[in-house]
Amino acid sequence: MPLSYQHFRKLLLLDDEAGPLEEELPRLADEGLNRRVAEDLNLGNPNVSIPWTHKVGNFTGLYSSTVPVFNPEWQTPSFPDIHLQEDIVDRCKQFVGPLTVNENRRLKLIMPARFYPNVTKYLPLDKGIKPYYPEHVVNHYFQARHYLHTLWKAGILYKRESTHSASFCGSPYSWEQDLQHGRLVFQTSKRHGDKSFCPQSPGILPRSSVGPCIQSQLRKSRLGPQPPQGQLAGRPQGGSGSIRARVHPSPWGTVGVEPSGSGHTHICASSSSSCLHQSAVRKAAYSLISTSKGHSSSGRAVELHHFPPNSSRSQSQGSVPSCWWLQFRNSKPCSEYCLCHIVNLIDDWGPCAEHGEHRIRTPRTPARVTGGVFLVDKNPHNTTESRLVVDFSQFSRGNTRVSWPKFAVPNLQSLTNLLSSNLSWLSLDVSAAFYHLPLHPAAMPHLLVGSSGLSRYVARLSSNSRIINHQHGTMQDLHNSCSRNLYVSLMLLYKTYGRKLHLYSHPIILGFRKIPMGVGLSPFLLAQFTSAICSVVRRAFPHCLAFSYMDDVVLGAKSVQHLESLYAAVTNFLVSLGIHVNPHKTKRWGYSLNFMGYVIGSWGTLPQEHIRQKIKLCFRKLPVNRPIDWKVCQRIVGLLGFAAPFTQCGYPALMPLYACISAKQAFTFSPTYKAFLSQQYLNLYPVARQRSGLCQVFADATPTGWGLAIGHQRMRGTFVSPLPIHTAELLAACFARSRSGAKLIGTDNSVVLSRKYTSFPWLLGCAANWILRGTSFVYVPSALNPADDPSRGRLGLYRPLLRLPYRPTTGRTSLYADSPSVPSHLPDRVHFASPLHVAWRPP
């Protein structure tokens, strides 16, 4: 007869009427019993002939793809002018005095952040915007382009202007102005009106002087992977290949690719016409994909071009119509859905390309992308705004993958010890936290996004037209892309974007200037940044608490009035550093803080209500006696694992599920196992904070017997059959807890100390977790353990009781000013006659 739920509870000693613990508990370690129970509960039966279930409630498993929903009404979020102050370390020093080693190190990491991948794969521009929504191709294209344009305008992206130069908006940082190691000095060239531009201005080296000496010095600079000929050295006169031969090698780095004539005609001409000509010519050059536009000769790091406003006159007035969009103007309509009807709607479509306020030299940047982008809902609660997803997963795959740095996240117990108190809480919302952290320009060539332009994108996706060679578009090729769908989409988009349609239909390549979300380095850098800032705030206000996890910052103070004044002071401090706090999204929590999915109050920690609801729903939908695909099990375990520490039996109760997932087998829930789990998750017990105290109770065991020292009392017992040592130590700890009721037990076993009972026999792990819930352990070396003698059967010899103080841990979150120094990477040699055993002093 299969095991009933009541019987199973009795077996696990979850009921009160169980026999004496010293007899019952060792039985649960018996392998035979564990195997019989597993068979009864149908836990280890992988060979099932029934087809697997691939969906349970909202959890989908193998062979199912969730189709993302496209929203044509998505709003692009606005990004404030985010500019983290460069002298952030000095500002923190003014605020709190000298910084600790840890804070200094963390802030240096992000000013600027550097990124050195092992290998970078460059993808064609067609892969820039992912065809994630096949039904809404054009719509998605323009929304994504608009999002990218918004990011560029907000100073979050660089725009690639040529192989070696890029432009950007916003305030420049010092590393964007001087070349590495101060070799070449930064000069600003303000080009206003008709002022002619002096060819020999200081800091601009004439071509001949950029000689091999500087080339070789530059080659050693740490700007990441170098082009072979010295990163900023001018190419040999005349360039190489037919494309570059048309680039006139002028010493002052003019933009513009001219067929002939002298190099500085653009500069001396009036700005408006020069810009006009440049944009026309630049368009012509664009189709030749990789043109180096004379910039390789300029010796400056950044030229700050201030383009006058009147320069954005339309290019359609008499200049070369090399632009796909404007060519429709002069062509005959091919049908009633021809694009020329749209292009003829207005005369002035604006410029073909926009240029940033500042220009910067970059390492060689190919006209390619390294990751694709697509849009999704901003979050499950906000579907009106979109969020840009950037896929730079190439850096995390294959043999050349980058191993991202690890960083400490406080576990549940540390978090509770830290935040469970009678303080009042509020949480701050940092808007676009990732986009605060600046990246070194050398990383730009590795983090490129962009698009190939509307014509290529549409041609790529429409089955009836082949990809056209756009070097010389003939009229026939031009109309290949006309279709009813495109026409209707563009007419609707014209209402939204107006003449920007023209700008967005051009190809563009953008590199990140601030850290993007799709790279494994970003969470690490953000965590370092916010934890350093919180550390500074904690030291400035020692009677308050500030804590952060990624972009979630919480403040706690003794009273509400105190909290409000703290909030004002901290917000002003953050704003002075250039951090954007969104005051509308500040949440005041009262005494129970909602943080990282938990509710934390003075009584301890519990999961938030929405997680409890999800768990209830999960059990309601969970089928019995049907094999469930392991991918679904993985998602179920993800949800249940989060709340496991709040149940009686904890993680060990989920072990059968873990085992089937790692074997990639289907799992069948028997009615008893399902009833057991749902009962476990019905009543959740808070995880309380640990208190410091003196340890008075000690446990020890040998494979054959156990011993306890409770105050001045000694006890011992033997096991019916010898047990593995870790199992014996765990049993001894359970006996100590049940005999003495002490919350603090001394043990010399590291596995018991770690409180992870998942590797023990399943039934024992579940029972021990319940018995030892809320117990803290203190390490005591065997030589000094008072319970050592009783466990070996000797009751006569008394070792004096130790005075072992216990301090609860807050993980690696140091709340005190003296943060630990950085450990050296080479550990000191540990001698076998360890000082711990010889001259051991209580911690």
Swiss-Prot record:
Molecular-function annotations in GO: DNA binding; DNA-directed DNA polymerase activity; metal ion binding; RNA-directed DNA polymerase activity; RNA-DNA hybrid ribonuclease activity
The Reverse transcriptase domain, residue ranges: 357-600
Pfam families referenced in this protein's UniProt entry, alphabetically: DNA_pol_viral_C, DNA_pol_viral_N, RVT_1
Segments of skewed composition (Low complexity): 308-319
Activation and inhibition: Activated by host HSP70 and HSP40 in vitro to be able to bind the epsilon loop of the pgRNA. Because deletion of the RNase H region renders the protein partly chaperone-independent, the chaperones may be needed indirectly to relieve occlusion of the RNA-binding site by this domain. Inhibited by several reverse-transcriptase inhibitors: Lamivudine, Adefovir and Entecavir.
Amino-acid positions noted as binding Mg(2+) in the UniProt annotation, renumbered to this chain: D429, D551, D552
Protein name (record): Protein P
Species in which this protein is naturally found: Hepatitis B virus genotype B1 (isolate Japan/Yamagata-2/1998) (HBV-B)
Gene label: P
